[in-house]
Amino acid sequence: MNPLLSAARVAIAVVWALGMLLPPSTWADGMPYVVKPIAEMKVKQLPKGPLYWRVENFPTLDQAKAAAGEYRWNPNTVTYDGWPSLTAEAAGKVFLFTLGPQGATTPGGTKVAEIGPVPSITAPEYLLRVNYGSGPPGSKTPDHSHFGSEAFYVLTGKLGQKTPHGISYVEAGHTMNGHMAGMPMEVFNAGTNDLTALIMFMVDATKPFSVPATLP
């Protein structure tokens, strides 16, 4: 089975489950903001040190995959070699997403954004996932939380995020770092045009990807 197709089905199931667990008024207040997984990987161990999401463009998907290399277990050093990387096509462009140190670059790539430091978590296994989010003005997600963090790079429009700390906004071409695990949130289109965004997750792979939450 195509892994991205399988992931997309999981995303649809998650959105459906959230909708079933929340009152109908949650969806009636605005159109749903749709998210679709475009890349993911699971790892048993994360690189050491503060980690940043690095977003880069490449001319072709093959070039991005070749530049990414492999994140492989080395029994001699009892650790992983390389940096965990994901490749995907979105909005007519090829992206390479790397979880690594601040200020690094990938040969052949054009840096688009760097987001971090990513709030750390401890888990038996980690899921790194990139979602493509989209929605018209007024669209929003149900109130939810993750067992990890999510970071945003907005492609078009204006993104809003409501948490117990308040409301934050991100314009196209800009980023927003994630919160600590368990943060209740609502993500919504805060502009007058269609919103599209790349959303990078680092979460506990042994727990549900997303769960309903309550905002004050």
Question: PLM features: residue spans?
Answer:
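A cytosolic small-molecule/anion-sensing beta-strand core signal
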Residues: 155
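Jelly-roll (double-stranded beta-helix
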Residues: 4-150, 158-216
